[in-house]
């Protein structure tokens, strides 16, 4: 029988091609067996954007998760997202697959405000981010550095208490006063004691969280360039950034001109690191991005937590009385609040922990991005999917918390659950590589003033308002502050320290 070599080669080639295609089909077929997480029905073009209209996003997402599950798919215009609403699912993202979800998605507002996303918050995972993280944990926000700011903390918050005392029996806008004091503290710790140089930053620092959380159609339809051109939000972000950049340039120039061997503030530390040289160069743009991070996150987080802690205690007079009794019992002997004894305030610390559970500073943790397609809990998560962890929902999961929507500080008195990223049912600061690096700094700026307020004053709601009538609605933003400012009447009960 005659064999035609060309025909044989053709047959073998066809056979090999057939086997390769079959294997590829098998792999594709196997992959298709893994579904995406379930989610609500999508509309053409806009996807699930209509589901987020109206109520606060973290409320809406929890309601939807009760129907579709703790891992839920949403289509936000052109962007695919998965919403995480349970401790188990959060652990998969923030621990088991943490490295695969270590980067952030690109966000135009963050790119502008964060100098091309070169800050610790939005920088992509890699060498630059690791270097910034190391600088933050070892140089800027270490326990030793936090302790070094103790005299500044005490001075700023005693001054605030004096302003409260000067009001006599009239009401004060507690929300506004505390935000201003917190900014004074953070700006002096970060930029130095010459407060008049950077007072102009405060309006920008207040506005930035709202701008970064604002809805911009160009973010969900990035392929439509016209939306970027038309975006009024984007124009406002650019204007705020330019003003902030101008002020920070002046502050950096003044620091260089008045160079001191003694590192008095965090900018001094950064400039010294820049001069000494690092593995990766630290540019002025990088330094400014870190400064913006510190100013915004430091001021916003502390003021939000204190505002809610005071509101919850005024809403629940029994809790307020219990906190005051403990603080006065511990400090009456000395006649003043001493930070070195804050650790003795078990109940007040429980109030802070419960506030962080019920009102996490960032109810929706900053999004992560899926690096490579992976499987989680039987679902496929495609590469480039945006991952949003609803910390507000996770912290209120009835599987872990009895009466999960109620404010009960007592639950933490004998509870070893903490917020250091080891217990995924309680993640007010996130967890894993992207966990907030400033927990120690933030807590010090919450516990000390709260102890002072409990020690020196009795508090009443303005206008004879009854506790049950206090409005506890939230405001939409990167942090969920109170919708309405908290107006309180402080009545001094313990003498303030002399100057």
UniProtKB/Swiss-Prot annotation:
The keyword Ribosomal protein is assigned to this record: no
Annotated EC: 1.14.14.62
Tissues/organs with expression: Expressed in leaf glandular trichomes.
GO biological process terms, semicolon-separated: diterpenoid biosynthetic process
Membrane-topology annotation of the record: Single-pass membrane protein
Keyword Cytoplasm: no
Residues binding heme, per UniProt: 436
Pathway linked to the protein: Secondary metabolite biosynthesis; terpenoid biosynthesis
Keyword annotations from UniProtKB, A to Z: Heme, Iron, Membrane, Metal-binding, Monooxygenase, Oxidoreductase, Transmembrane, Transmembrane helix
Location(s) in or outside the cell: Membrane
Domain of life: Eukaryota
Pfam annotation, one family: p450
Xref: CDD domains: CYP71-like
Reactions performed catalytically: ferruginol + reduced [NADPH--hemoprotein reductase] + O2 = salviol + oxidized [NADPH--hemoprotein reductase] + H2O + H(+)
Membrane-spanning parts: 4-24
Role noted for this protein: Monooxygenase involved in the biosynthesis of labdane-related diterpenes natural products. Catalyzes the oxidation of ferruginol to produce salviol. Salviol is an intermediate in the biosynthesis of carnosate, a potent antioxidant.
Name of the protein this chain belongs to: Salviol synthase
Phylogenetic placement of the source organism: Eukaryota, Viridiplantae, Streptophyta, Embryophyta, Tracheophyta
């Amino acid at each position: 029988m005659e064999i035609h070599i060309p025909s044989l080669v053709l047959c073998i080639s066809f056979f090999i091609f057939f086997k390769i295609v079959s294997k590829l089909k098998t792999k594709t077929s196997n992959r298709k067996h893994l579904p995406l997480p379930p989610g609500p029905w999508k509309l053409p073009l806009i996807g699930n954007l209509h589901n987020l209209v109206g109520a606060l996003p973290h409320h809406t997402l929890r309601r939807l998760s009760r129907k579709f599950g703790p891992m839920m798919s949403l289509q936000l215009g052109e962007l695919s997202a998965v919403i995480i609403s349970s401790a188990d699912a959060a652990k998969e993202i923030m621990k088991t697959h943490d490295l695969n979800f270590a980067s952030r998605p690109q966000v135009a507002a963050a790119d502008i405000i964060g100098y091309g996303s070169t800050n610790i918050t939005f920088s992509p995972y890699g060498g630059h981010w690791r270097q910034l993280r190391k600088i933050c944990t070892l140089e800027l926000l270490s326990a030793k550095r936090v302790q070094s700011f103790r005299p500044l903390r005490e001075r700023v918050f005693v001054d605030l208490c004096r302003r409260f005392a000067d009001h006599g029996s009239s009401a004060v806008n507690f929300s506004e006063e505390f935000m201003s004091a917190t900014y004074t503290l953070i700006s002096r710790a970060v930029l130095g004691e010459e407060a008049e140089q950077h007072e102009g930053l405060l309006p920008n620092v207040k506005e930035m969280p709202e701008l970064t959380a604002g809805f911009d159609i160009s973010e969900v339809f990035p392929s439509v360039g016209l939306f970027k051109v038309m975006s009024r939000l984007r124009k406002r972000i650019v204007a705020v950034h330019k003003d902030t950049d101008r002020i920070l340039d002046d502050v950096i120039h003044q620091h260089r001109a008045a160079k001191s061997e003694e590192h008095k503030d965090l900018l001094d530390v950064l400039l010294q690191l820049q001069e000494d040289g690092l593995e990766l160069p630290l540019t002025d743009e990088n330094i400014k991005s870190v400064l913006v991070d510190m100013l915004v996150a430091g001021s916003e987080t502390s003021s939000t937590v204190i505002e809610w802690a005071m509101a919850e205690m005024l809403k629940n007079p029994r809790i307020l009385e219990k906190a005051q009794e403990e603080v006065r019992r511990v400090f009456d002997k000395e006649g003043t609040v001493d930070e070195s004894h804050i650790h003795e305030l078990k109940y007040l610390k429980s109030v802070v922990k419960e506030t962080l559970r019920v009102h996490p500073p960032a109810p929706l943790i900053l999004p992560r991005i899926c690096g490579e397609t992976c499987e989680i809990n039987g679902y496929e998560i495609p590469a480039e999917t945006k991952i949003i962890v609803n910390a507000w929902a996770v912290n209120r999961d009835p599987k872990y918390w009895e009466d999960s929507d109620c404010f009960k500080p007592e639950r933490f008195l004998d509870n070893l659950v903490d917020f250091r990223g080891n217990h995924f049912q309680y993640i007010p600061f996130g967890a894993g590589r992207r966990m907030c690096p400033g927990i120690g700094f933030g807590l010090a700026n919450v516990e000390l003033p709260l102890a002072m307020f409990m020690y020196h004053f009795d508090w009443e709601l303005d206008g004879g308002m009854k506790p049950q009538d206090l409005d506890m609605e939230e405001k939409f933003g990167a942090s969920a502050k109170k919708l309405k400012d908290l107006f309180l009447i402080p009545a001094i009960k313990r003498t303030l320290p002399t100057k």
